[in-house]
Regions:
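Conserved HGGG/HGGXW glycine-rich cap/lid loop of the alpha/beta-hydrolase fold
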Residues: 3-47, 64
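Glycine-rich His-Gly loop
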Residues: 10-14, 80-81, 223
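Active-site loop/oxyanion-hole signature of alpha/beta-hydrolase fold enzymes
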Residues: 36-78, 108, 117-120, 264
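Short glycine-rich catalytic loops that host catalytic nucleophiles or stabilize transition states
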Residues: 38, 246-251
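Conserved hydrolase catalytic core segment
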Residues: 73-116
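Flexible "cap/lid" loop of the alpha/beta hydrolase fold
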Residues: 101-141, 230
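Conserved serine/cysteine hydrolase catalytic core
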Residues: 164, 173-238
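Catalytic histidine-centered segment of alpha/beta-hydrolase-like enzymes
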Residues: 250-263
C-alpha cells in the first residue's frame, strides 16, 4: 500500500510562472510531496491586481480550498518572494486551510519600513523606487526561444541559474507569437502585470497580522546573499517565525540556482515544524 503524498500549495515569485520551478517540484515529488500551484498570478480578470493584493490573496484562498477539499486536510503553504507574502496573508485570513507556512526568501515588511512604503505609495512615487522601475522597461520579445535563452543566460540575475531551470523558464515563461516573418518569442508573464504587482506591495502586513494572527507555524528559508533580506530587514520575520529560519547559499533567486538543495531544505524545514510527525 503506497503512502499518500503530503499536499503542498506553492506560490511563485513575481514574473516567474509556476512551471519555472519544475526541477524543484520534481524533487519535492520524489520526497513524498504533491505540489499544486497557480501558474500565473495577476492574469485572471476575476482576481485583479490592486493595492495590497486582496484579490490575489483571495485567488490563493479559493485555489487552496479546492486542494484542501480534495485532500481532506489542511495543506502546507509555500511561497517564493511574492508567493510567500500571499501565502502568509492567505493563512492569516483562512486559518483552516493552512497546516504550516514556509516563506522562501520572503522577508516580511513591518514597522517604519512599512510606514515609509505607505507614504511613498500615497505620494504616487512607488514606481520610481520599487523593482517596478526596472520591470516596466524589461525586454519582452526575441527572434526565437534560443535567442531568449541566450539573452537571459547572460543577465546577472540569471547567470547562476541551474541550466534546466533556465530551460524551463524559456519553455514556460515565454511563448511563440505571430506567423511567418512576424513570428517571435515573447514573455508570457505580462510586463504591466509584473510592474503593478511590485508597485502595490502590501504596506499593511503588520496591521493585518495583528487583526488576524497566523494560527499555524511559520518558517523561513533565505539566501545567504539575498539583497531583499538586507533591504527589508528580518525583525518582523524573526518575530513571526519564532526563530525558525534557515539559510541556503545563494541569492534571492536561490530556488532557481540550486533547486535540488532547495527541495532538501524545504523538506527539512517542513519536517521540523511543530506538530509534524
Amino acid at each position: 500500500m503506497s503512502v499518500p503524498s503530503i499536499p503542498i500549495v506553492f506560490s511563485h515569485a513575481n514574473s516567474f510562472p509556476a512551471s519555472t520551478y519544475g526541477v524543484l517540484f520534481k524533487s519535492l515529488k520524489a520526497r513524498g510531496f504533491a505540489v499544486r500551484a497557480i501558474e500565473k498570478f495577476g492574469h485572471d480578470p476575476q482576481y485583479p491586481v490592486t493595492d495590497n493584493w486582496p484579490h490575489l490573496v483571495q485567488q490563493l484562498i479559493d485555489f487552496t480550498q479546492a486542494v484542501v477539499d480534495k485532500a481532506g486536510e489542511p495543506v502546507f503553504l509555500l511561497g517564493h518572494s511574492f508567493g510567500g507574502f500571499v501565502s502568509l496573508m492567505a493563512a492569516a485570513l483562512a486559518p483552516t486551510l493552512a497546516r504550516d507556512v514556509l516563506l522562501i526568501d520572503s522577508p516580511i515588511l513591518g514597522g517604519w519600513r512599512a510606514t515609509t512604503l505607505g507614504v511613498i505609495k500615497s505620494a504616487q512615487m512607488v514606481g520610481s523606487v520599487s523593482p517596478g522601475a526596472t520591470s516596466q522597461r524589461r525586454r519582452t520579445h526575441w527572434a526565437d526561444a534560443e535567442a531568449a535563452l541566450e539573452h537571459f543566460r547572460h543577465k546577472k540575475a540569471f547567470a547562476k541559474w541551474d541550466p534546466l531551470v533556465l530551460r524551463d523558464y524559456i519553455a514556460h515563461g515565454t511563448h511563440d507569437e505571430g506567423r511567418g516573418e512576424d513570428r517571435k518569442r515573447v514573455l508570457s508573464f505580462d510586463r504591466a502585470v509584473e510592474t503593478t504587482i511590485y508597485n502595490t506591495l502590501p504596506d499593511n502586513l503588520d496591521s493585518l497580522l495583528k487583526r488576524h494572527p497566523v494560527k499555524c507555524p511559520v518558517s523561513f528559508i533565505g539566501g545567504t546573499h539575498s539583497a531583499e533580506m538586507k533591504q527589508v530587514g528580518m525583525a518582523m520575520t524573526e518575530k513571526i517565525t519564532h526563530g525558525r529560519i534557515m539559510l541556503i547559499d545563494g541569492s534571492h533567486l536561490f530556488p532557481m540556482e540550486k533547486p535540488l538543495a532547495t527541495a532538501a531544505a524545504i523538506e527539512a524545514s517542513l519536517l521540523c515544524m511543530p506538530g509534524v510527525v
